Amino acid sequence: MIKNIILVIIIVGAAILVYIYMKKDTGEMKNVEMLARKGMSVIGGDIAYFGNVRGFYAYPEKEGEYPGVVMIHEWWGLNDNIKDMAQELAKEGYRVLAVDLFGKVAATPDEARAQTAGLDQTKALENLKAATNFLRQAGAPKVASLGWCFGGRQSVELAISGVKLDATVVYYGSGLATTVDKLKPIKWPVLGIFGDKDQSIPTETVRAFELSLNTLGIKNEIYIYPGVGHAFANPSGMNYAPEETKDAWAKTLAFLKESMIK
């Protein structure tokens, strides 16, 4: 009897560990519970913005003129965590369109890696520009881009594509453009959030990015958090750092308010 009880405990324990591991690998855990603040009542739902491509659009319920933010997902795709973050940002008085660059959500890191590797960058930029136009047509007087990881790089790619923005936010986007020549098109403030243990974006690369922005006279805020690695703001990842995530989000809100509302 005791052996049977022990066996059941082992099986249940193993199942729990597998569940936790799967949750960490799929990007489906959320930040919104920790970052939630009292704010405006918002409306959110799926909407077509680029042909048949549907994103998630969140905006304040009260009518008004609100700035817009193009929100760009990580390599997982447009999952529930990103949709919740869109609603959380909308509470602060923004029209937020969380784009979909893949058309599906990856279930494993291998799937995420494959869909990122197969991205058509030209089409991705068309997608992002359509999102920018959507927000302007919705009445946003100013538009910013904000992305994490894969989306962080795409946030910068949009900024240097020739489209007019009013602010750019990048969370640890690997493969960043760092040269003066490539960053020349940017004419607005940039916020960069990074970790000094991020092997995919060495501190030297971040400093090169910052130096080029300074050389071009582009107002910028670059933060490198000590002791944290890549995707530290992703609650599904092994590198998740809650306190740094809260601080980075507070800095993001302050930056957007300064750049878009004041």
Q: What do these predicted regions represent?
A:
Residues 164-174:
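A conserved short beta-strand
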Residues 147-151, 155:
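Gly/Ala-rich beta-loop-alpha elbow adjacent to hydrolase catalytic centers
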Residues 214-262:
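C-terminal catalytic histidine-bearing segment of alpha/beta-hydrolase fold enzymes
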